[in-house]
């Protein structure tokens, strides 16, 4: 919850987006709705969620994202490791992954690094990690300025991985302060972060949900991490097409040069309303199909159903590969989630995919299971 900016203390803010009151779409089977509104601090220009459920609700026992459930992400992990290896001698490095989830990256990087530590508050995921792997440890907690003292993490790491985590933390400024302290001198931070300026410019409002707590941008991160220099900028060559990938290195240099242009997020409420209308039109145009189901019971799907009554009328089933989601429902609806292996695909003539970046993975999987109908991507 934001009443004043936790960075500069200013109370003046500009409305960026207001989704109204919607369910927690990153969770399943929830009926309660909460306001989802983003405002930009007029002084430091960082955009925050104005009101949000607390982290213990968002990432407690009902949270259901497991990184190992995506074969595409498992394959992508090798690209992360290769990128890190081009910038530092990994086998001599102590590595920290913040937001390690169930250890998909940790398992692969452990054999290539000196030591590996993962930290994540999601206990159901961290408990699945095999801690018998040599030189590897898991901390089940939030990463912040208190945690780095409690677990003795200050100046312990040559490499810190922050992969699509930063826009989900409760206090982004405290997080960045703690982040700057755990890195050794000349150590690096590997970032992948959703660039919400690009998201808004492309009218991809399905990227918003409870749990996206701030819309901090790469150029703002670069300025806030004072003793760090950008040594590699890979643009949007990342797992998600809207995620910016770059590496910052801790340095003692005083003459800091900035890599990223000084840009900021502007109000997009009118575009959001047009997007809502476009979602309704998209599903109205599916009237020629006999049986339409969704694919991917994720936050994107939940947001679409939260803002579109037409989508909820058209789709009653969403398929997913995650067994933990089986037979549950999309929050705020009666839409049921079915495991793809337990559903008769021959009865379907159209599937709507809610996550476009895994299209090839899903298309291949469906064809291998004998699906011959249409696969559409929800992109307006």
Put a short name on every predicted segment:
Residues 133-148:
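Conserved SAM-binding strand-loop segment of SAM-dependent methyltransferases
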Residues 173-188:
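A short glycine-rich, Lys/Arg-flanked "PGG" loop and its adjoining helix->strand segment in the class I
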Residues 1-72, 236:
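N-terminal juxtadomain amphipathic helix
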Residues 92-101, 292-295:
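Conserved class I S-adenosyl-L-methionine
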Residues 161:
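A conserved beta-strand element that flanks and buttresses the S-adenosyl-L-methionine
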Residues 186-194, 375-376:
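Conserved beta-strand signature within the Rossmann-like core of class I S-adenosyl-L-methionine
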Residues 84, 245-380:
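Hydrophobic, well-ordered beta-alpha structural blocks that scaffold small-molecule cofactor pockets
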Residues 21, 191-214, 218-222:
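Short, glycine-/aromatic-enriched active-site segment of Class I SAM-dependent methyltransferases
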